[in-house]
């Protein structure tokens, strides 16, 4: 039987212009130092009493934020790896997922925001501090408002232009808000731990210079010896503020500015300095700045992460420095969408929206553990090759042995959302146990923007987000603008060091910011459940199939001697005792002594398995069901023509690559495949073997001439005798 797949190849003529670029620099001392301008601003409560309080702009929703600053497109069309799909894509797609807990709390911070909303917020011990565009507001821990929505002008005066970042300095129990100025940056910290009743120490934009450039896209981090800020500027793109003095409202607090050497960009850039997640600080110095480097950009030979180390001497700035960077090799990635432009992801209606490319997303987070330090970060990538486009989240955990030691890549992954939806606009952090939580935006051409989350336990297989996706909020309208969010923000609750608070933008029906809180770490002492049926799997099956399941300990205590059961369709329930011990967050397998009959060809079976622990405190995650098919033995098909793809400079010797899928259960070898173009057919033999229920890519030895401009249709097929 012949089964065919078609691919339409369109040859395009595109003119490529060369750009000139400066030479790479060296490690540097500060390029700029200055004492910050200081003022004290009364509390929100006092401002309301004396009539000086400035509320949030009631007409903010009518306004459009500043355009993103583009410093020349430095993307080289056709340059860089991977040549195919993201190399980590299939690891995530084949992940065995565990159930995730439902959101704990969901609430909106604003329904009155300009475009985009610039959502940011951090959870403190007593309040959630939210900000957007040019406003901010404090919320009680139950999501109810604790203060009126306030204009940033009530702290900074008229010289502020939005792009706020809200921070909480857990070590000193203070709340921080920042914003852009006309040619500088604003910074304010609460005088005490009650940001509504306490006043504010404000450091003004007039002395926070960016060398005359607009301080686009500022991103802040807390480190032991300073508050660090990166900006999307062509030079003077890193700043450090004197944390110890700022905490005390010292008018002599200073700032040091740097040019990060050897930072190559696509024309828009946002590096991140590591932000300390909790109040366990490393020793002062050796702050780390990270930026991705895509080999699709000019002057970047391979995909990698670039690492800078910053050391500050507040007594003598001549001793301060930013290092020459070192590189961490990564799996290849494509961070470029639409040649570097901002209109990327297709909605069901309205304009394509910004995927937020070339950005290490807010924030890159640091956490100390007894045996090592960890850092987590992410950025958006295009996970599919050719003209197909799928936004996914490339994420990393870096580790160092002790403070100040070199970083290494401990794990990396590419997270894709289910159902072919985009995943982008992510923010992530680690909890006290080393579990990773990640919030993100998702959408497709048929589904509106939603806010969701996933994560992984510390002991899970590396490179995988193992928790089932969960929903925070679903938009009921599309985005009327190309601009979307610009960034998102996830923080960890300091009260338990476990609960994640995520905020981003959605539409209900207008533009709004939505907070969702969720937790991965256990709140229960005893909580176990089946997370997968490991065998049998779909294929050629018998009347005596061995049943093996995986059991996960969600709880904090070690458990043993509990019952585990399975049921085939509506048949008898088989129950056995697992006599081993399972530690917290450990996964174990159990193989039943009783087999299952799955012998009827073409039948879909369901096996459901579950645990029974008398002291289990959460029964919602006890069971898992799996559908298993007894496959026909012989069933092959071509499922994709993956190359060549439409583009420029196609040659007379283009290789033709197809994907062949074995839908059957029997291994296949020495079968024929063909491709046909304009009446000419090429047939070759695939030696195999191709295992049942699997795929392979086959590259034809006879190439294809696509050197003439035009449109070509490629039809590919496979022939297998006795194909069912």
Enumerate the predicted regions with their spans.
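Short secondary-structure junctions and interdomain/linker hinges
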Residues: 8, 12, 19, 234, ...
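Intrinsically disordered, low-complexity Ser/Thr/Pro-rich tracts
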Residues: 5, 9, 211-212, 531
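C-terminal PAP-associated
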Residues: 23-523
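Polar/charged alpha-helical tracts
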Residues: 3, 28-33, 42-63, 142-144, ...
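Extracellular/luminal regions of secreted and cell-surface proteins that mediate adhesion/ECM remodeling
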Residues: 523-724
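Bacterial Sec-dependent N-terminal signal peptides
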Residues: 1-26, 608
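Sterically constrained small-residue positions within well-ordered secondary structures
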Residues: 13, 112, 157, 168, ...
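Residue-level signal for beta-strand positions within conserved beta-sheet cores that form or flank
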Residues: 18, 391, 449, 498, ...
């Amino acid at each position: 039987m012949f089964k065919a797949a078609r691919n339409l190849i369109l040859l395009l003529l595109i003119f490529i212009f060369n750009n000139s670029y400066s030479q790479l620099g060296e490690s540097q001392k500060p390029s700029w130092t200055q004492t910050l301008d200081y003022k004290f601003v009364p509390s929100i409560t006092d401002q309301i009493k004396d009539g000086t309080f400035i509320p949030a702009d009631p007409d903010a929703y009518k306004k459009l934020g500043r355009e993103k600053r583009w410093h020349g497109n430095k993307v080289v069309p056709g340059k860089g790896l991977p040549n195919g799909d993201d190399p980590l894509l299939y690891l995530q797609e084949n992940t065995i997922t565990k159930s995730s807990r439902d959101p704990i709390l969901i609430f909106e911070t604003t329904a009155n925001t300009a475009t985009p909303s610039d959502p940011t917020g951090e959870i403190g011990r007593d309040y959630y501090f939210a900000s957007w565009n040019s406003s901010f507001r404090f919320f009680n821990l139950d999501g109810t408002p604790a203060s009126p929505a306030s204009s940033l002008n009530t702290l900074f005066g008229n010289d502020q232009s939005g792009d706020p970042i809200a921070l909480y300095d857990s070590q000193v129990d203070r709340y921080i808000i920042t914003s852009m100025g006309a040619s500088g940056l604003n910074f304010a910290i609460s005088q005490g731990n009650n940001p509504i009743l306490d006043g504010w120490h404000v450091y003004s934009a007039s002395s926070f210079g960016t060398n005359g450039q607009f301080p686009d896209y500022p991103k802040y981090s807390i480190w032991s010896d300073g508050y660090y800020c990166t900006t999307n500027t062509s030079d003077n793109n890193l700043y450090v503020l004197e944390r110890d003095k700022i905490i005390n409202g010292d008018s002599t607090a200073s700032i040091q500015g740097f040019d990060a050497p050897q930072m190559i960009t696509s024309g828009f850039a946002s590096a991140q300095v590591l932000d300390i997640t909790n109040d366990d600080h490393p020793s002062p110095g050796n702050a780390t700045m990270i930026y991705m480097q895509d080999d699709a950009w000019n002057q970047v030979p391979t995909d990698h992460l670039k690492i800078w180390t910053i050391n500050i001497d507040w007594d003598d700035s001549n001793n301060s420095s930013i290092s020459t960077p070192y590189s961490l090799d990564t799996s290849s990635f494509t961070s470029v969408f639409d040649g570097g432009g901002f209109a990327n992801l297709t909605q069901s209606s309205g304009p394509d929206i910004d995927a937020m490319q070339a950005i290490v997303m807010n924030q890159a987070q640091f956490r100390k553990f007894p045996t090592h330090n960890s850092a987590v970060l992410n950025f958006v990538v295009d996970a599919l090759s050719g003209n197909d486009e799928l936004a996914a989240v490339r994420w990393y955990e870096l580790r160092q042995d002790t403070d100040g030691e070199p970083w290494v890549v401990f794990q990396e992954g590419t997270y894709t959302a289910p159902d072919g939806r985009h995943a982008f606009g992510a923010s992530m952090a680690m909890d006290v146990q080393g579990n990773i939580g990640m919030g993100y935006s998702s959408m497709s051409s048929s589904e509106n923007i939603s806010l969701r989350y996933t994560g992984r336990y510390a002991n899970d297989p590396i490179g995988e987000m193992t928790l089932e996706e969960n929903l925070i909020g679903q938009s009921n309208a599309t985005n009327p603008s190309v601009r979307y969010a610009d960034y998102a923000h996830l923080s960890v609750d300091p009260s338990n060091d476990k609960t994640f608070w995520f905020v981003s933008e959605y539409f209900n029906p207008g533009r709004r910011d939505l907070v969702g809180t969720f937790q991965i770490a256990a709140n229960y002492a005893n909580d176990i459940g089946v997370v997968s049926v490991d065998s049998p799997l779909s294929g050629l099956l018998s009347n005596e199939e061995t049943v093996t399941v995986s059991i996960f300990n969600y709880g904090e205590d070690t458990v043993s001697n509990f019952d585990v059961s399975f049921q085939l369709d509506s048949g008898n329930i088989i129950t056995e005792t697992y006599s081993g011990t399972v530690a917290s967050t450990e996964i174990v397998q159990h193989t039943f002594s009783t087999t299952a009959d799955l012998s009827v060809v073409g039948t879909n079976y369901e096996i459901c398995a579950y645990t029974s622990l008398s002291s289990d405190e959460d029964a919602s995650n006890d069971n898992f069901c799996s559908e298993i098919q007894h496959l026909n033995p012989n069933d092959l098909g071509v499922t994709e023509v993956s190359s060549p793809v439409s583009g420029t400079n196609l040659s007379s010797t283009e290789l033709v690559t197809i994907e062949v899928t074995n839908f059957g259960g029997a291994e296949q070898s020495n079968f024929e495949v063909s491709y046909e173009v304009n009446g000419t057919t090429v047939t070759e033999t695939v030696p195999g073997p191709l295992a049942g229920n699997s795929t392979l890519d086959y590259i034809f030895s006879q190439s294809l001439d696509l050197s003439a401009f035009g449109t070509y249709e490629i039809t590919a097929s496979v022939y297998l005798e006795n194909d069912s």
